[in-house]
A protein has these predicted regions:
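Flexible, gly/pro- and Lys/Arg-enriched active-site loops
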Residues: 301-340
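Short beta-strand scaffold segments in enzyme catalytic cores
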Residues: 16-24, 151-152, 354
């Protein structure tokens, strides 16, 4: 079930997986496929039940056990609840990994099964299942996007040479993995400095990839009208987040196809907490932050980053003035450092990827 959930995540779905077992043999497998199939009923449980029905030649699954990574839904939304399908199929035992924090579910799915006599075992591999759903859990509980700060750097901590050149730090395998991340995340965010320096398109380059919503933090609306993100704004959703209240200036970008969100200023920058609230209201549940050192520091200082993804190449750039991933004012003493936890290391050819969760002091937690 976890493997199916991971497969769902790769395809940009909410990572839920399900298997149905009869007499020790898997007879049905399913994962969330709503986006892929554009079908409201394509929840993991529904897919697994349909496959088991076909395999056994029966709509009744009385002698079967169902294993699912996330508590089955019990509310009517765009489809009937998965709990209803489980009961209708006559499944006698359900094993659940994670409880669903969604207030519409939150234990109600498990309770509904038990009331009807289904044996339910909770919390099996809970930590592993929770990790699969970090983005979903964060968004459903905070109403703000899950933000992953991603950068590529050399082993001496440089994201560019002293001349500002950065193509390419990592090799093909690492860059291909970045495209997978762009496919999975709802939004991608950079600062205007990145636009001015690199003029990136900020799209997903993989075949059949899904382009994230592009978000540019531009305090004074300095993004050139000929920049690629503006030139393609009518084809790919693009948001300019700014503190510039000039209606004439805003209208120029809107006419080009951009959405302009005017925000307050905080510590000399766009109020990123306010921006996250606005983006959450638009159902943007996750953001890949590909900013430079200034924006990355502002995001950490604001407490909006949940994860760091560092792609590290076995190279040394040197250079006192060469850019680093996190700049800004910095912390005064080592004890004030932003701490990272639950780190995971992945080899990508000669490069490595380190993914860590950010641990904030209580005063910074959103």
């Amino acid at each position: 079930a976890r493997a199916r959930a991971q497969e769902a995540a790769v395809h940009g779905e909410v990572p839920v997986g399900c298997v149905i077992v009869r007499n020790g043999e898997i007879v049905g497998r399913g994962r969330n496929q709503r986006e892929e199939k554009q079908a409201a009923v394509s929840h993991a449980e529904m897919e697994a039940i349909a496959q088991a029905n076909a395999a056994l030649g029966s709509w009744r699954l009385d002698e079967c056990d169902l294993y699912v990574t996330l508590e089955p839904c019990c509310h009517f939304g765009k489809q009937p609840p998965c709990v209803n399908a489980i009961l209708e199929a006559g499944i006698s035992r359900v094993v659940v990994g994670s409880a669903d924090p969604n207030p519409l579910v939150s234990g109600k799915g498990i309770a509904a099964l038990r009331v009807q006599g289904v044996a339910v075992t909770e919390g099996v591999l809970r930590e592993e299942c929770d990790a699969l759903n970090r983005i979903f859990f964060h968004f459903i509980t905070t109403k703000r996007p899950f933000v992953s700060m991603k950068y590529a750097m050399t082993m001496d901590g440089k994201i560019a040479t002293v001349t500002g050149a950065s193509k390419w730090i990592t090799r093909e395998a690492a860059r291909a993995d970045v495209q997978q991340q762009r496919h999975r995340f709802s939004g991608i965010m950079v600062g205007v400095g990145t636009i001015l320096a690199d003029d990136p398109l900020l799209t997903c380059h993989m075949e059949n990839g899904k382009n994230p919503v592009r978000i540019v933090c531009d305090t004074q609306l300095r993004t050139p009208l000929q920049a690629q993100v503006v030139a393609t704004a009518k084809q790919i959703p693009t948001i300019l987040a700014t503190c510039c209240a000039d209606p004439t200036r805003q209208a120029i970008y809107r006419q080009a196809g951009c959405r302009v969100i005017c925000l307050d200023k905080r510590n000399g920058h766009i109020d990123l907490v306010q921006l996250m609230e606005k983006l959450g209201q638009e159902q943007i549940d996750s953001i890949l932050l590909e900013g430079g050192g200034t924006l990355n520091w502002a995001a950490l200082e604001s407490g909006v980053v949940q994860q760091v993804q560092a792609y590290i190449a076995p190279k040394l750039f040197g250079g006192q003035e060469a850019k680093t991933p996190v700049e800004g004012a910095g912390v005064p003493v080592p004890s004030a450092a932003f701490r990272l936890k639950n780190s995971r290391l992945t080899h990508l050819g000669e490069d490595i990827l380190i993914e860590s969760e950010v641990e904030y002091p209580c005063s910074l937690e959103l």
